[in-house]
């Protein structure tokens, strides 16, 4: 096996002007830096939409995508956002990710871009190939109309179409922009090492769509949860709270959902 080296740098840590690192020019500059330094790998953290504590290891879906990584300058060049809207997103604290501001403003801007986006055959073909992202989009639309409550408390079944449309646009745009960065890196001899969460959140599209694949009771509460025993990092151990998989149930359909989860499948990573 050939010895090689790489750098772990999540997309959010790339330099940029819009509150968070993105798939913009800084991503290509980082690839150039890796090539110049003789590196062979770029490793990232999961691309999942992070939870309220900004952790990509706890998300609304294994197949979700972080909208903050979308390059806004590319959307401007495509005529999907205005110059005024672009400049309105310039960061106010340049050396950190502006999480609170992103929560308040980014999806609203992407919703405008989604409304202006005309779609097309390539757009629809994407969802034929990546149908698993549709469940996530429907889930987010359901949460929106139910006041962001966990899915087992939903009373409204009618989805918010504008939210569904926005998340479809986010997924398509994310993949399209990421593919350009990945292809650029591969062309420079840089392979991408990906990552995904080991478990999923209880309130997630994964559990909502496939509750039988998890160890839950009739009220959708986990009967067993994930964690780790005491170790040198935590004398009391850790209780993560994620529902455990029901492997016997998954075996009935050949573990189909798990076969979609590897980052090489979800996001097209090299490893």
Language-model-derived ranges and their functions:
Residues 1-38:
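Mature N-terminal, pre-catalytic/accessory segment of carbohydrate-active enzymes
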Residues 5-9, 42-43, 192-194, 271:
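Hydrophobic faces of well-ordered beta-strands that scaffold small-molecule active sites
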Residues 8-10, 16-19, 54-175, 200-271:
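Alpha-amylase-like alpha-glycosidases and glucanotransferases acting on alpha-linked glucans and related
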Residues 25-32, 125, 176-184, 258-261:
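Short alpha-helical segments and helix-capping/turn motifs at coil-helix boundaries
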Residues 25-50, 264-269:
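Catalytic domains of carbohydrate-active enzymes, especially glycoside hydrolases
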Residues 34, 44, 139, 185, ...:
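Conserved, mostly hydrophobic/aromatic
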Residues 43-53, 196-202:
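Short, solvent-exposed turn/loop segments enriched in Gly/Ser/Thr/Pro and often Arg
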Residues 167, 171-201:
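Conserved, well-ordered alpha-helix/loop/beta-strand core segments that scaffold catalytic motifs
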